[in-house]
Amino acid sequence: MATDNVHIGEIEKFGSHAHRWWDPDGELKTLHAVNPLRMQFIQAHTSLAGRKAVDVGCGGGILTEALAKAGADALGIDLSEDLLGTAEEHCRESGLTVAYRQISAEALADSQPGEFDVVTCMEMLEHVPDPASVVAACTRLAKPGGTVFFSTLNRSLKAYLLAIVGAEYLLRMIPRGTHDFASFIRPSELSRWARDGGLDLAGMEGIGYNPITGQFHLTSDIGVNYLAAFRKPAAAG
């Protein structure tokens, strides 16, 4: 059964950035900077051409459009009307074919279970009251043999110092108040929720940042930001 797994304050907070979501030099420039790494990680674990993909918590559509450009039949879902409006407008300007819906992961999983080859949920789990519910919904959305991707922040001292103190207050890479440390998720927690739904871990990598060069990179260090890929076992027979 679908739940109202939503934090209205979070929706309003991110919706307030809708008008500059696609500005690569704006408040959310970090999303633009890390998106190529997200795509690199995704494409290392699955092909996208001709695949049916859903981007959960798509925001203004940065990753959703990248999935479509790589050949996926992409659907982006979010609960922010403002962000979906931004996503749809940018999609039209880009000449891409992307579908967007204002619906929760849980509700979509109730209506379209097992329909997607690829499920992505990036930088979203730490912004909902019940992240385990979203993980379960993403699992249900995936076809047998499909791949489910998450990215979030580790609940570690290093993440607090770098992602909050450093990124929000010292370097001002992202708006202050973007993150709540208590909502960060340890890799062991994410892996347990995924296992509970029957997913198998396929890979996990961190996202590192070099403050001297201003460049992001994939790394084996999952102490701060990390990406995880899980596979849903293929149907027997």
Swiss-Prot record:
Protein origin, superkingdom = Bacteria
Its UniProt entry gives the catalysed reaction(s) as: a 3-demethylubiquinol + S-adenosyl-L-methionine = a ubiquinol + S-adenosyl-L-homocysteine + H(+); a 3-(all-trans-polyprenyl)benzene-1,2-diol + S-adenosyl-L-methionine = a 2-methoxy-6-(all-trans-polyprenyl)phenol + S-adenosyl-L-homocysteine + H(+)
A single Pfam family it belongs to is Methyltransf_11
Give one GO term, molecular function aspect.
2-polyprenyl-6-hydroxyphenol methylase activity
Listed A to Z, the keywords are: Methyltransferase, S-adenosyl-L-methionine, Transferase, Ubiquinone biosynthesis
Q: Please explain the role this protein plays, according to its UniProt record.
A: O-methyltransferase that catalyzes the 2 O-methylation steps in the ubiquinone biosynthetic pathway.
Keyword Methyltransferase set for record: yes
Starting at the broadest rank, the lineage of the source organism is: Bacteria, Pseudomonadati, Pseudomonadota, Gammaproteobacteria, Methylococcales
Which amino acid positions bind S-adenosyl-L-methionine, per UniProt?
Answer: R38, G57, D78, M122
Disulfide-bonded cysteine pairs: these are none
Give the similarity note. Belongs to the methyltransferase superfamily. UbiG/COQ3 family.
Which EC number(s) are documented for this chain? Answer: 2.1.1.222, 2.1.1.64
HAMAP family linked: UbiG
CDD domains the UniProt entry points to: AdoMet_MTases (cd02440)
Q: Which protein, by its recorded name, is this? A: Ubiquinone biosynthesis O-methyltransferase
State the NCBIfam families in the record.
Answer: UbiG
The biological processes this protein is annotated with in GO are: methylation
InterPro entries attached here?
Methyltransf_11, SAM-dependent_MTases_sf, UbiG_MeTrfase
